[in-house]
Amino acid sequence: MKKILGIVVVVALIGIGYQFQSSEEEEEFVPKPDSATLRKTTSGSLLGYTGANGAWVWRGIRYAKAPTGTLRWRAPLPAKAPRKGGIIETLVSGNACPQLPSALSEPADEDRVTIGEEDCLFMDIYAPPEAEKAPVMFWLHGGGNTIGQGSSYSGENLAMKHGVVVVTINYRLGIFGWFSHPSLTTGDPKDDSGNYGTLDAIQGLQWVQGNIENFGGDPNNVTVFGESAGGVDTLAMMASPLAEGLFHRAIVQ
């Protein structure tokens, strides 16, 4: 029985890996703005593109204000649409969060030890064309909460093969994501929690609740799923009162 179960698990993981492929497979594809993907959101009017397999894709969506300067080591604040208005092309994923180079990232420049930028709270969305009330799958990447980024994974196959809207996000990592010190105390429970990476994920879910219907997703049918550290972060979503009502199912690997 154990042997059979092991085979089933391996086959299942291989299948998931095929459906949720690495974005590296799309390097030769050059995205072009598609007017059919224009969507109005709380982050502004977003223009995406049609992916190689037909999925509609929006990359580099700012879901929270840049956690820099006075917002470093503070709870995330919602992103706002630019005052000047206009259309924001979302063809390229946003910055990775600061981290050491790894197998999950690009190499560092010769003059830098780390990669990424503090201005990194971005998400990518993948949806079947003309989707309506489709289930939403909200991905939390792994990497020990110190490395990785949401854009390392493309949700195009998952969206097209299973009729779901896939959301992947970046969240703060390492000392920027989980850190507390008496000198940072403000008296605000969220700001003083030290759990900034967790709060980023919750802010991402709040953005989904307010906007995903415009992408064909159902805000009342949201599944959070993650692997490794992303699985632990998924458990944190299940445990946090702040995430209550923001999602309805969870998958932990």
Where are these predicted regions, by residue range?
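Short glycine-enriched nucleophile-adjacent loop
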Residues: 231-243
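A conserved short beta-strand
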Residues: 244-253
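Alpha/beta-hydrolase fold nucleophile elbow
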Residues: 135, 208, 215-227
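Non-catalytic accessory segments of hydrolases
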Residues: 6, 10, 19-195
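Positively charged n-region of N-terminal signal peptides that target proteins for export
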Residues: 1-4
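Surface-exposed acidic, glycine-flexible loop patches that form ligand/cofactor-binding
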Residues: 126-132, 210-218, 241-244
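Alpha/beta-hydrolase active-site loop
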Residues: 120-121, 190-214
